[in-house]
A protein has these predicted regions:
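Acidic, serine/threonine-rich low-complexity disordered tracts
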Residues: 1-51, 99-227
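Surface-exposed beta-loop interaction hotspot
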Residues: 59-99
């Protein structure tokens, strides 16, 4: 199966992530490809993850701001629960009464490293759509860096902020809203669904159409067939 998430910004920036995964009893990442480029991001970056071999390739610009590209390739021992590109999919499949769910993620900082995501439901919150009242489950996703780096990250101001996601439950769960950064050290963006807007069309004069349709009706017997 394939999941793709694309954000196109007004300034021309693009966030494009495609994840290929299997869904046999459990979700299993096969391949993930992330591209971030444009003024909205500090540095353009491209990350490729091969779930079968553990190879992770990160392409980004140097910190000195020059145009030259830096490529880092590493092999990681990827656990079966690695969730790059699958977080929203997983949230729509997690039981809302689960106390906490933990999954793994490859973080490009820019050197690839494994971190944990701790997903905790915070209860239901009301919202409305089309005049109809609904309730969405509010999830908090916390990044656990682990090791010595995890111990000093909060002290150095490098602990990533929590991600907040709201999911509409039911037989067909759906994403409602999220508040999260799209890259390490980036601002928190609010992402939510919007209603489609159609171009204004002139009002249809149904009475005129009815009269026009009536005027083209042939009287009885007007149509005949000659042999």
């Amino acid at each position: 199966m394939t999941s793709r998430l694309v954000f196109r910004f007004k300034d021309g920036s693009v966030h494009d992530e495609t994840a290929i995964f299997s869904q046999r009893h459990n979700f299993r990442l096969l391949n993930d490809h992330l591209v971030q480029k444009g003024p909205a991001f500090q540095h353009p970056i491209e990350v490729s993850i091969d779930g079968s071999t553990g190879q992770v390739t990160v392409r980004n610009a140097d910190d000195d701001g020059k145009e030259k590209e830096k490529v880092v390739t590493d092999h990681l021992d990827l656990p079966p629960d690695v969730a790059n590109g699958l977080v929203l999919t997983l949230l729509k499949n997690i039981r809302s009464d689960a106390l906490q769910t933990k999954v793994s993620m490859v973080a490009a900082t820019p050197k690839p490293r494994m971190v944990k995501l701790a997903i905790t439901p915070q209860g239901e919150e009301p919202f409305s759509i089309g005049g109809s009242s609904r309730k969405a489950t509010h999830y908090v996703v916390k990044v656990e860096i682990g090791g010595a780096a995890g111990l000093v990250a909060p002290l150095l101001g490098k602990q990533p902020p929590d991600t907040h996601v709201w999911i509409l439950g039911g037989k067909a769960p759906a994403f409602v809203k999220s508040e999260r950064p799209l890259y390490f050290g980036g601002p928190i963006w609010r992402i939510e669904l919007v209603s489609p807007v159609w171009p204004r069309m002139p009002a249809v004069d149904f009475e005129r159409l009815r009269r026009k349709a009536k005027s083209v009706h042939a009287p009885p017997g007007a149509l005949s067939m000659n042999n």
